[in-house]
Design a protein with these regions (language model features):
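A short, structured active-site edge motif that brings together acidic residues
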Residues: 42, 122-136
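Surface-exposed amphipathic alpha-helices with a cationic face
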Residues: 89-97, 144, 164-168
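Acidic, Mg2+-coordinating phosphoryl-transfer loop and its flanking beta/alpha structural elements
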Residues: 156-194
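Conserved Lys-Pro-Asp/Glu-containing loop-to-beta segment of HAD-superfamily phosphomonoesterases
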Residues: 6, 138-164
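N-terminal helical cap/lid subdomain that shapes the substrate entry/recognition surface
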Residues: 2-89
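Conserved phosphate-coupling serine/threonine residues in phosphotransfer and NTP-handling enzymes
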Residues: 14, 106-108
């Protein structure tokens, strides 16, 4: 792991647990169109990125622009909380201490990220945050180019199959973390370079191999 100098993190399910407000908001969108709510397990088994693939399956008749507006409205109204996942702040601190560059690449709304990261005390840890990346494969190459970083020295940490596919698309090392939306079985199908239970385990690997 000591060859990696650039750490790209996903947000939802990787650094934070935001499943509460995400599920609440999604269910309110579905209810608005007369659809049944998802249970937590149902949502995790069905949800996928890019968002369009998920909504095309269940609400193909509704324009994405309309869905995004409704989702944002309901998310802002949700009483559900967002929490830092175990090891999140610690791994960001260690990356800073070791002189590594840290980036965010997430589909989260820019304002939601700014609010959540400030409230959770981690907004200052990122060299740059790329938000509203609806298809991360389209964004990761731009991230590498913008910051003049080598894919050989870069890894991407995420909790979903789309994150692993994004890393592979850019030729960077992929880390699947099992604290988020996709199950271990789903992550294994994507064949990441490394699977960890949580960021505490990844931090231990970084500390012992740096």
């Amino acid at each position: 792991m000591n060859k990696f100098k650039n750490y790209i993190f996903d947000w939802s399910g990787t650094l934070v647990d935001d499943l509460g407000p995400v599920l609440d908001s999604t269910n309110r969108v579905f209810n608005y169109y007369g659809k049944d709510s998802f249970t937590r397990d149902e949502f995790c088994s069905e949800f996928c990125l890019p968002f369009k693939n998920f909504y095309d399956k269940f609400l193909p008749e509704v324009p994405m622009s309309e869905l995004e507006l409704l989702y944002t409205k309901f998310f802002n109204q949700s009483d559900e909380n967002v929490f830092l996942l175990p090891g999140a702040k610690e791994i960001l601190c260690e990356c800073r201490n070791l002189g590594f560059k840290t980036y965010l690449l997430s589909s989260i709304k820019k304002q939601h990220f700014e609010n959540q990261s400030a409230e959770l005390g981690v907004s200052d840890f990122f060299d740059f945050a790329y938000t509203e990346a609806l298809d991360k494969r389209d964004w990761i190459t731009m991230l590498l180019k913008d910051n003049n970083i080598s894919h050989e020295e870069t890894l991407f940490i995420g909790d979903m199959q789309h994150d692993i596919e994004t890393a592979r698309h850019a030729g960077v090392f992929s880390v699947g973390v099992l604290t988020g939306y996709n199950s271990k079985e789903m992550i294994e199908v994507s064949q990441p370079d490394l699977i960890v239970n949580d960021l505490v385990e990844l931090l231990d690997i970084i500390v012992n191999k740096s």
